[in-house]
Swiss-Prot record:
Protein's cellular compartments: Secreted; Target cell membrane
Keywords from the UniProt entry: Amidation, Antibiotic, Antimicrobial, Cleavage on pair of basic residues, Cytolysis, Fungicide, Hemolysis, Membrane, Secreted, Signal, Target cell membrane, Target membrane, Toxin, Transmembrane
Signal peptide from the UniProt entry: 1-23
Name of the protein this chain belongs to: Venom antimicrobial peptide-6
Function summary: Amphipathic peptide that exhibits extensive cytolytic activities against both prokaryotic and eukaryotic cells. Is more potent against Gram-positive bacteria (lethal concentration (LC)=0.25-2.9 uM) than against Gram-negative bacteria (LC=6.2->50 uM), and fungi ((LC)=14.1->50 uM). Shows hemolytic activity against rabbit erythrocytes (37.7% of inhibition at 6.25 uM) and cytolysis against rat dorsal root ganglions. In vivo, intravenous injection into mice tail provokes uncomfortable symptoms with a death rate of 12.5%.
Organism: Mesobuthus eupeus (Lesser Asian scorpion)
GO MF assignments: toxin activity
Amino acid sequence: MKSQTFFLLFLVVFLLAITQSEAIFGAIAGLLKNIFGKRSLRDMDTMKYLYDPSLSAADLKTLQKLMENY
């Protein structure tokens, strides 16, 4: 009975370690993708790609002012 309990605890700890390392590797991969991705290497203006026919030029200018320091 002791060996089964020990084995169960070992498996639980092992599975926790695997899931944590997978999360860390995923976060590192996502960070590298964001740093070295195609879009991040270019200087892109996000407001340039905003398209909504209901927005006027004054609305876009106001949005740009609001998003300057964001």
